[in-house]
Every structure is written in structure tokens, then in C-alpha cells.
């Protein structure tokens, strides 16, 4: 029986997610032996600038995908929100397990609510999407970029001049940090999450049928359907996770309901639409067309241009 080598980033969160996937596969009856191989990605190496300035798609996946092409690893576990809208030829997202919490978490010193933060208070985030939506809600706040893993960011909130930070709820839960740290859960009505937030992507070589059949055991149809709508929208706007784009879908009966967002980083323009329909890719396409007709493409292109300077 073959040994399966799983590639992942070396952060605590990435390792925890990978161990969770292996655990789920074993619970599903997979008897193979697994080995985890830690891989350093470009996004992990560059910590002194904002992610959006680093630019490029696949900041956290390219090196891992190369290891897969080179057959150093058999499969990879990624955060879905790190996945570019287009997967390299020869590779495929072979399984999408059940999604963890999709929401953003707002953590504040002294648990001060977002609406009660004083004027000029500093909110830490490395995401233009989060920054744009916070500024749309509270233009009097100051957004300051913050990098590092979850534990580092929480420490920075406690020790540095941040009044609050925004993190993904799923990340906090996965690394086992107490949800008591969370001051407020930001529902999609307040802050539309990143496309695929809370979901994982298991990526493998397209021609490896044996492995595809193994990882399909933990594939979740509900998550796959909703993520498909979100990622279709992302693909049509040609946005990576470093652009102020958000998308969250859920199922209502047999309909997919997608809320899609594109915003100016300063929060002055927020384009947001909710679309529903039975076919996930059609829903994603309709949302993209609606926002493009309102000027979303111009915002995305302008942000990309500013990043390249």
C-alpha cells in the first residue's frame, strides 16, 4: 500500500489543517500511511510588506504545486482562499471537505465593539477586502497592516498600538484558540468573507486516479457547490485573494445564494449584490456581470495597477 506524502506550508494553522485532513481520511477508512512535508512559500518569506504589495496570484501555493509536479509530494492541503481562480494544467482540486466557520472575527483590546471604537482607532488587517469594508462602516478609523501567523497577530494586538484586529474565525478555531478572544463575529451582511473562506482545498495531480478516489471520501457536496459559485465569480473578475473582493454562498433548498462584493480599498465605493439560482457557476457568473456593469472591473484593475507600482 502506497505511502501518501502531503505537502503544506509550515505555519501552525497549515499543519493543523493538514493533520485534520489526514485524520478525517483515516476516520473514513483510509489505511494508507501518511507523511507531511513542510514547504516554504513566497508568501511565508516576505513578512515586511503588505500581501497586496507582494502581488501575484498563488503566493502561498506555487512552491507547493511545483513539489507536486516534481513528484516530491502526492497531494497538498491549502486554505481555499489562498487558491488562485485558475489551477495549473495537470493539477486539480480533487476534494473539498466540509467548510469550517466562514465569518471574520473582530478582536479588540478591552472587548470594545466595532461601533464603539473611538475616532482614529487603529484596526490591524493584511486584507484589502477587510480594510475596505471596515472603512465603509467606519471611515473615521485607521487601517494598519499586520502580518504574521494568527498567534503573532494576537500578540501584536496585546503588545502594540492596535486597538483591534480582524482574523478568520476558522483559523482561530482550527489552531485551538479560545473563541472567548473574539469580541464580535462579523456576519456577511457586515463583512463579506473572502471567496472560499473557512474551506480547504485538497489538490493533487489530475492523472493520479488512485489518490483522487481516496480523497473523495471526505468531499462535501454542499461546500463544493457553494465554493464553486464563489470561485466562478472570482475567476470572472480576475481577482486574487489580494484584491478587495469578497464572496459567500450558502444553499437555500436547491438554490445557491451568493453575496458578492468588490470595494475600493479606502471604503469609499462598495459594490455588493446577492444573486440566487440553481446552477452554482451561473450564479457566480451573474454576480460577476452585475458588479462589472457597476464598475467592478475598473476598481480591480486600478488596485492591481497600484500594486505593481
UniProtKB/Swiss-Prot annotation:
The modification S-(dipyrrolylmethanemethyl)cysteine is found at residue 241. Disulfide bonds: none annotated. Its cofactor is dipyrromethane. One of its GO terms (cellular component) is cytoplasm. One of its GO terms (molecular function) is hydroxymethylbilane synthase activity. It catalyses: 4 porphobilinogen + H2O = hydroxymethylbilane + 4 NH4(+). Its EC number is 2.5.1.61. It is an enzyme of class 2 (transferase). The keyword Transferase applies. GO terms for biological process: protoporphyrinogen IX biosynthetic process. InterPro entries: HemC, Porphobilin_deaminase_cofac_BS, Porphobilin_deaminase_N, Porphobilinogen_deaminase_C, Porphobilinogen_deaminase_C_sf. NCBIfam families: hemC. PANTHER family: PORPHOBILINOGEN DEAMINASE (PTHR11557:SF0). Tetrapolymerization of the monopyrrole PBG into the hydroxymethylbilane pre-uroporphyrinogen in several discrete steps. Monomer. This is Porphobilinogen deaminase.
Amino acid at each position: 500500500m502506497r505511502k501518501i506524502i502531503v505537502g503544506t506550508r509550515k505555519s501552525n494553522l497549515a499543519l493543523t489543517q493538514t493533520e485534520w485532513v489526514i485524520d478525517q481520511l483515516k476516520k473514513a477508512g483510509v489505511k494508507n500511511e501518511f507523511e507531511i512535508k513542510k514547504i516554504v512559500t513566497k508568501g511565508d518569506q516576505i513578512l515586511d510588506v503588505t500581501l497586496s504589495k507582494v502581488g501575484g496570484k498563488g503566493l502561498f501555493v506555487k512552491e507547493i504545486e511545483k513539489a507536486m509536479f516534481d513528484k516530491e509530494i502526492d497531494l497538498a492541503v491549502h486554505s481555499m482562499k489562498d487558491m488562485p481562480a485558475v489551477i495549473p494544467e495537470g493539477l486539480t482540486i480533487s476534494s473539498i471537505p466540509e467548510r469550517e466557520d466562514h465569518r471574520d472575527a473582530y478582536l479588540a483590546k478591552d472587548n470594545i465593539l466595532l461601533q464603539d471604537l473611538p475616532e482614529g482607532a487603529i484596526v490591524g488587517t493584511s486584507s484589502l477586502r477587510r480594510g475596505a469594508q471596515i472603512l465603509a462602516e467606519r471611515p473615521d478609523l485607521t487601517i494598519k497592516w499586520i502580518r504574521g501567523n494568527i498567534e503573532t497577530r494576537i500578540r501584536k494586538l496585546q503588545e502594540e498600538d492596535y486597538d483591534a484586529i480582524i482574523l478568520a474565525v476558522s483559523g482561530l478555531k482550527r489552531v485551538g484558540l479560545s473563541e472567548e478572544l473574539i469580541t464580535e463575529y462579523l456576519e456577511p451582511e457586515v463583512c463579506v468573507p473572502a471567496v472560499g473562506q473557512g474551506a480547504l482545498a485538497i489538490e493533487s495531480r489530475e492523472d493520479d486516479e488512485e489518490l483522487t478516489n481516496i480523497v473523495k471520501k471526505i468531499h462535501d457536496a454542499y461546500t463544493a457547490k457553494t465554493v464553486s459559485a464563489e470561485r466562478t465569480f472570482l475567476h470572472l473578475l480576475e481577482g486574487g485573494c489580494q484584491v478587495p473582493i469578497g464572496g459567500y454562498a450558502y444553499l437555500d433548498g436547491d438554490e445557491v445564494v451568493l453575496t458578492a462584493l468588490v470595494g475600493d480599498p479606502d471604503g469609499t465605493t462598495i459594490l455588493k449584490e446577492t444573486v440566487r439560482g440553481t446552477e452554482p457557476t451561473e450564479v457566480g457568473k451573474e454576480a460577476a456581470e452585475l458588479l462589472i456593469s457597476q464598475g467592478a472591473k475598473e476598481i480591480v484593475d486600478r488596485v492591481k495597477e497600484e500594486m505593481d507600482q
